[in-house]
Amino acid sequence: MVLEMLNPMHYNITSMVPEAMPAATMPILLLTGLFLLVWNYEGTSSIPGPGYCMGIGPLISHGRFLWMGIGNACNYYNRMYGEFMRVWISGEETLIISKSSSMFHVMKHNHYSSRFGSKLGLQCIGMHEKGIIFNNNPDLWKTTRPLFMKALSGPGLVRMVTVCAESLNTHLDRLEEVTNESGFIDVLTLLRCVMLDTSNTLFLRIPLDENAIVFKIQGYFDAWQALLIKPDIFFKISWLYKKYEKSVKDLKDAIEVLMAEKRRRISAEEKLEEHIDFATELILAEKRGDLTRENVNQCMLEMLIAAPDTMSVSLFFMLFLIAKHPNVEEAIMKEIQTVVGERDVKIDDIQKLKVVENFIYESMRYQPVVDLVMRKALEDDVIDGYPVKKGTNIILNIGRMHRLEFFPKPNEFTLENFAKNVPYRYFQPFGFGPRSCAGKYIAMVMMKSILVTLLRRFHVKTLGGECVESLQKTNDLALHPDHTKSMLEMIFTPRNSGWCLEH
């Protein structure tokens, strides 16, 4: 857009006027020059980006984010203005960074440990100063994070391998539940149910209706994505956000019922089990006065949605990549046979599965699901020579950074990109530092366990030659396949058998 190309400039009006110019023209030119200066001026910034344009620039940049989605808009602006640039969201200065050195600086410092988003939007979805994912109150976030870290490490991490494998095998034995009339597998639904079942087994342990909860999780995610950066005026028109409010309420009500049952069971027990699960830890924290009941429910909600929301889509993309790259599948199967053999995968196998690990890393680099991180500066700072004021919003465009620096073949899917160790400043699928993903270690365990268990039993194939590159996707808060425009089903062929589910 033309307005976005108008950057702050210095005009020397008199040098542009010919000597023979009529005297009456001079005031007009001076006024025009003054107008242009005001038009493009917000306070001179050394950071590249669209012009302020008497407030029109911020409206256009925010509008672009709402129209294109956060991820697509970030890629657009980085292409237009470079890897460190400035826009506005809700009138607030926002930096979009895809430069590794700048990203490293932001991730490692505590004064970037807060997130940003519409306060009204976060209140609507229950994340404003609650839970862990978008809790932008650093003090309250520090109260909940240790509870998540404890649940996602130690005994929970060790048990995850067996729990994942058992859950997946159970669901694979009931494939007809996610198989259509043509014999094609609804892989995303399968993976989401497995992820939810695994999370419930480890962290809540209350019987639930998987399909109903998975459906409500998708509705909640759609609301979260839609409301995160909406302007305040949006929330003054009830019919605009009513459907999102209902989607949020549906999931929150379901979690309330599950947690009420958990509280009832805890009260009925004479003695707590030796290994206390996450839900019990939350309820005990509530009884101590550390957390409110509402915050407890929000923490449980976020623990249950994390894997079905992001990890299931990551695994879905991985299966599509395996289907397109038989040489990669062959290398993975060879390693599985060598490390695991004919038995079930165990915790001791996880570190030995290097080919599987490199495949996961390359998949997350080449086709990420979460390819951006949103932060807020809590104090004045300087990043790579650019001044950053307290309160500045920051979006780290991780997906773009993974395609710009270090990797020998950044625009290709190949395990050669991880043939040698990659310095962690150049590869951050989970982030690092004080606000890194709390579940980054257990996520790797889950993905390895799922891939080994599934690929040992089935060869996977896409429909009609569909591949990751050809899938229609939405790129907003996260990058998801668009089920309305692409064929997302797959064919599962049992290994060591001529029988195929497509027949």
Swiss-Prot record:
EC numbers, comma separated: 1.14.14.14
Keyword annotations from UniProtKB, A to Z: Heme, Iron, Lipid metabolism, Membrane, Metal-binding, Monooxygenase, Oxidoreductase
Entries under InterPro entries matching the protein: Cyt_P450 (IPR001128), Cyt_P450_CS (IPR017972), Cyt_P450_E_grp-I (IPR002401), Cyt_P450_sf (IPR036396), Cytochrome_P450_Monoox (IPR050196)
Cofactor(s) needed for function: heme
Membrane topology: Peripheral membrane protein
PROSITE patterns: CYTOCHROME_P450
Catalytic reaction annotation: testosterone + 3 reduced [NADPH--hemoprotein reductase] + 3 O2 = 17beta-estradiol + formate + 3 oxidized [NADPH--hemoprotein reductase] + 4 H2O + 4 H(+); androst-4-ene-3,17-dione + 3 reduced [NADPH--hemoprotein reductase] + 3 O2 = estrone + formate + 3 oxidized [NADPH--hemoprotein reductase] + 4 H2O + 4 H(+)
GO CC, alphabetical: endoplasmic reticulum; membrane
Gene Ontology biological process: female gonad development; lipid metabolic process; response to estradiol
Subcellular compartments: Membrane
MF GO annotations: aromatase activity; heme binding; iron ion binding
Broadest EC class assigned to this enzyme: oxidoreductase
Family: Belongs to the cytochrome P450 family.
Entry protein name: Aromatase
UniProt gene name: CYP19A1
